Regions:
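Short, non-helical or kinked segments that cap or interrupt transmembrane helices
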Residues: 25-44, 81-94, 211-223, 236-241, ...
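Alpha-helical transmembrane segments within multi-pass membrane transporters and channels
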Residues: 56-103, 245, 250
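Transmembrane helix-bundle core of multi-pass membrane transporters
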Residues: 98-160, 263-268, 286, 291-293
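Helix-loop-helix "hairpin" substructures at the membrane interface of multi-pass membrane proteins
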Residues: 136-213, 236-241
């Protein structure tokens, strides 16, 4: 039974990281540094919970998260691509804006700056109102199923489609791509919007799984997803595998925390510490897109 519970925790913890890492891969393959994954997760979680509370529909909640991420990606593109601002600065600013903005919106909508009301657990909100097992509870969230599908679709997009080849060209040789008639700014904007939408679905997983939005609930997962992008060498499948591995560490943290064997502070730092060591060990082997900046 413990194995089933741990599997459920892995699925729930890995899905946000996998989706956020895919968004990071799409964005960075176009030549734009993406440090705003934390913001996308927060905005996706917030939009999903607000839409879920308003509509009672899990489909509407997931769509709202994707839309919020797409709009955030468009905002990122406006400054980083069209206004030529530093993508690093834009990413940090968007993270700060998302943290402060969601707190302010919580206060306005629900009278609390810390958390939202709890989502209903009716048949309309979740596939099964009362999950009989932890595994069924995890699988009742559609983003767990969407994540592996988007891994495959992202890999096919980048390797088998004209848009994917253009995204890669813009990330490797933007001047050559422009000389061949490729609208570099538009392609990068498309990649950022798609990447934002996909990453925000990871936020939907956070909100729907916890049945509420809690201020700063992303908890640094966006930066773990950035690490997964680097460890995966900017390839969708590899990045997803690393993200799933990091998610497994988070699930292990939850399992060990319930046992009381290890101090909570140590467990909370474990995924970040091990990910940092992995990035340090493999950074010399990773080849980023040539024009990434």
């Amino acid at each position: 039974m413990m194995a089933v519970v741990f599997l459920a925790q892995v699925l729930s913890a890995a899905a946000p990281l996998v989706l956020a890492s895919l968004g990071g891969v799409l964005s960075e393959r176009s030549g734009v540094t993406m440090l705003a994954l934390e913001a996308y997760l927060l905005l996706g979680a917030f939009a999903a919970v607000v839409a879920g509370l308003a509509s009672g529909s899990i489909v509407v909640a997931v769509l709202a998260a994707g839309l919020a991420g797409a709009l955030a990606g468009a905002l990122f593109a406006l400054f980083a691509v069209w206004q030529r601002a530093s993508s690093v600065v834009v990413g940090v600013a968007l993270n700060l804006l998302a943290m402060a903005g969601t707190r302010a919106a919580l206060k306005v909508l629900y009278g609390s700056s810390s958390n939202s009301p709890t989502l209903p657990t009716s048949e309309g909100m979740r596939g099964s109102t009362l999950a009989w097992t932890a595994l069924r509870d995890a699988l009742s969230t559609p983003t767990v199923w969407i994540a592996p599908l988007l891994v495959v679709l992202s890999a096919l997009l980048l390797s088998r489609t004209v848009l994917g080849l253009r995204i890669t060209a813009c990330g490797e040789h933007p001047m050559a791509a422009r000389a061949q008639g490729v609208p570099v700014a538009r392609v990068q904007t498309t990649a950022l919007v798609l990447g934002g939408a996909i990453a925000a679905l990871g936020g939907a997983q956070l909100g729907l799984h916890q049945h509420a939005f809690v201020a700063s609930m992303s908890g640094g997962r966006g930066f773990l997803a950035v690490a997964a992008v680097i460890l995966g060498r900017w390839r969708p499948v590899r990045a997803a595998v690393w993200a799933a591995g990091i998610g497994s560490l988070s699930a292990l943290e939850a399992t060990l925390a319930s046992s009381g064997w290890v101090p909570t502070v140590v467990l909370q730092a474990l995924p970040f510490a091990l990910t940092l060591l992995a990035v340090a060990g493999r950074s010399g082997k990773a080849r980023a897109p040539a024009a990434l900046g």
